[in-house]
Amino acid sequence: MLSLVSSEGYINLIERRVDVAIRAGSLHDSALRARHLFDSRLKLVAAPNYLARCGTPETVADLAQHTLIGFTEPKTLNDWPFADSGNTPYPAVPHLVANSGETIRQLCLTGNGIACLSDFTVATDIASGRLCELLPGCALNAAKPFHAVYYSDNAVSPKIRVFVDFLAERLGGQKED
């Protein structure tokens, strides 16, 4: 049986009986095996109707005058890698929060504010004009790694290995020996 669980929060694979999780950002649990899948840059985006109604920010400091959409957890997802000068990420204080990147994307698409989302999530929306990229010249050079993680034991199930190999091949990672 295949069961998919969607969560932006940290889950304990053993407690939840999860075979494989996709994690974004730095990995902290050394008890897990990890396979790099791809890197993704973050982009600030808003819908054209939001920008027509509220104006387009011209600097990172201007974001303080806008409705920001962010994550409930982890809070580090609200440290946006954008700066007018220096390398300090912008500490976004969201007016709307959600626990799902897809929910945040939908809130953004419907003109509810500005969000910071992974480029793989919003690339099609930007290309089609449904979302506008904001302040690309202020982006810090920070790509977020995405990994498949799974419990580390001596005998990884062949099904898990094949699935992780498939993800890595499909998403651009390297095949594990």
Language-model-derived ranges and their functions:
Residues 89-134, 139-141, 150:
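Hydrophobic hinge/microswitch elements
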Residues 31-42, 46-68:
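Flexible hinge/capping segments at coil-to-helix
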Residues 35, 61, 105-106, 161:
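Alpha-helical segments flanking ligand/cofactor-binding loops in enzyme cores
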Residues 3-7, 134, 149:
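Solvent-exposed beta-strand sheet faces enriched in polar/charged residues
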